[in-house]
A protein has these predicted regions:
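Non-catalytic alpha/beta scaffold blocks inside enzyme catalytic domains
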Residues: 1-134, 196-263
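Long, low-complexity segments enriched in small/aliphatic residues
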Residues: 118-212
């Protein structure tokens, strides 16, 4: 199931429990009311996190997890480069790495996981995934390897030099059919909401709201074009209520020509 389908199933009652790891869905999902309805209807919710957050407020059990600085493993970036991450500190208090948590829960359920550490997980991935066949912690070293990695450890800094892995050797381009927006302006909702990003925060701020960045940008505001503001009697600094089919919010307005009329 996709996430919206999981939430629908929780509301309907066919999904009765969830285990959410490292994802503050009650903060980051665009339809928060939908999420709240789903989480509130669960019979059992486990949240595995490094901090308490909006999602953990619905949890029956919170499993304290280690941050990325407190656990070893690997990550792969958009350059196809796999790199080793080494823990710089031990997890505080009762916090444990994700692998330790999964191992302990699995053991209590009667199945011992065959991993003593992230090296064993990487070995299994290499055994099951041809593109990672030659990957080991030792070979990754300080600079990592770019997959595909042959069994002898040779990696692929350039993925395609002369042709693509297709019968004719050429890339495929496909035209996608037009899909109208999910919501359009109407008599009841005449304006279109455009959500954006702020330099000071990463995405919806589930991480950066816990840093000094909050002093640089502590709250959101609504930008509205002067034409729309005049029609609605709104001035910069006014606190306005914004309503949609999904929910409502009270927020400070800023009148600016940065935004187009009707948005």
């Amino acid at each position: 199931l996709k996430m919206p389908e999981m939430l629908d199933a929780a509301i309907e009652g066919s999904i009765k429990a969830m285990w959410i790891c490292g994802y503050d869905i009650a903060q980051s999902d665009p339809d928060v009311d939908h999420v709240v309805a789903a989480l509130s209807n669960l019979e059992f919710l486990v949240v595995q996190e490094i901090f308490e957050n909006e999602t953990s407020s619905f949890a029956h059990v919170i499993l304290p997890a280690a941050s990325f600085l407190e656990k070893s493993g690997t990550f792969t970036n958009a350059e196809r480069r796999m790199q080793v991450v080494q823990a710089a500190a031990s997890p505080p208090g009762a916090a444990k790495t994700d692998l330790e948590i999964y191992g302990l829960i699995s053991a209590r359920l009667g199945h011992e996981l065959p991993y003593e550490g992230p090296e064993d997980v990487m070995a299994e991935i290499a055994d099951l995934t041809p593109h990672f066949a030659g990957v080991t912690f030792e070979r990754l070293g300080r600079r990592g390897l770019q997959w595909p990695v042959a069994a002898d450890g040779t990696d692929s800094p350039v993925l395609y030099e002369t042709a693509f892995e297709l019968p004719e050797g050429r890339a495929h381009f496909a035209a996608l059919p037009y899909k109208p927006p999910g919501d359009e302006a109407s008599e009841d909702y005449p304006l279109i909401l455009v959500t954006g990003r702020r330099l000071e925060h990463y995405n919806v701020g589930t991480m950066t709201r816990r840093t000094g960045n909050l002093e640089l940008f502590s709250s959101d505001w609504l930008e509205i074009h002067p034409e729309d503001a005049q029609e609605l009697g709104i001035a910069s600094g006014d606190v306005v209520e914004v309503r949609s089919k999904k929910g409502r919010i009270e927020i400070e307005a800023q009148v600016t020509e940065r935004i187009e009329p009707g948005h």
